[in-house]
Curated annotation (Swiss-Prot):
Protein name in UniProt: ATP synthase subunit a
Family: Belongs to the ATPase A chain family.
Disulfide bonds: none
CDD domains: ATP-synt_Fo_a_6 (cd00310)
Species this chain originates from: Desulforamulus reducens (strain ATCC BAA-1160 / DSM 100696 / MI-1)
């Protein structure tokens, strides 16, 4: 396939998905269907769609946190509090077993926040005409950059400058090349893994919902859409868990000696 033919096919698919989004736009908000609209601020191109979805996600996270803590009761916790306690204990088992008590206590709030934010961000795209912030690679690269900063911060704190730099020369000095390649690949793979799974899920959901819209009848569009929506909910949780666990593993790799003292 030539480059021109590939571009034409991509444009055709884009137009089809755009048409589906327009037909499903029961919010009647033009901004939610303008894929190509950007804000240009100080030389930067900013997607208002992604920004608004990010604000909505943050609001949902804050609302969830408020619901979990508004009526704290040790003896008879509410449903939101009980859900959060189960989540905290589950993730806490992973954090403290890999990072130890001291580093685990420092990382625990960050890991839980990562998980909750990514879950809400992933699931937001399952609502027709809305989109997941994590379906934008700029968001996932931003999250990956935070992980990289955490890795080096805790690595320097645990091992000092000399020990942290010396990590790149282990077990032999020539391995520094491999470690540097790994350093570049780590945030790239972390970002694209999350972005690719969520973006692909959104595209397929739009296609399946489009089948309903073009009179494919109940068994032609509705049932596959419901099945894929259920699977997408599962994928949304799994990808949040994978991102959180990889963050734990990467921090543990650079601050390993703290994990030995739990």
């Amino acid at each position: 396939m030539s480059a021109a033919a590939g571009a034409a096919q991509a444009a055709e698919h884009h137009d089809m998905l755009h048409m589906v989004e327009m037909d499903l736009n029961f919010w009647n908000i033009p901004l939610f269907t303008e894929y190509d609209k950007y804000w240009h601020i100080m030389g930067l191109s900013i997607s208002p769609r992604t920004m608004i979805m990010t604000w909505i996600t943050m609001a949902l996270v804050l609302l969830f946190a408020w619901a979990c803590t508004k009526n704290q009761n040790v003896r008879s916790p509410g449903k939101a509090q009980a859900t959060f306690e189960v989540l905290w204990e589950f993730l806490g088992g992973q954090v403290f077993s890999n990072l130890g008590n001291k580093l685990g206590a420092a990382m625990m709030p960050i890991i839980v926040t990562f998980f909750i934010y990514i879950v809400f961000a992933n699931l937001l795209g399952l609502i027709p005409t809305l989109s997941s912030p994590t379906a934008d690679k700029n968001t996932t690269f931003g999250l990956a950059l935070i992980v990289v900063l955490l890795i080096h911060y805790h690595g320097l704190k645990a091992n000092g400058v000399g020990g942290h730099i010396g990590h790149y020369f282990q077990p032999f000095k020539p391995f520094v090349v491999i470690h540097l390649i790994e350093e570049i690949a780590r945030p790239v793979t972390l970002a694209f893994r999350l972005y690719g799974n969520i973006f692909a899920g959104e595209v397929l959901i739009a296609v399946l919902l489009g089948l309903i819209n073009i009179n494919a009848y109940v068994f032609g569009g509705f049932i596959p859409s419901v099945i894929w929506l259920a699977f997408s909910v599962f994928v949304g949780f799994v990808q949040a868990f994978v991102f959180s666990m990889l963050t734990i593993a990467y921090v543990s790799q650079f601050a390993a000696h703290e994990a030995d003292h739990h």
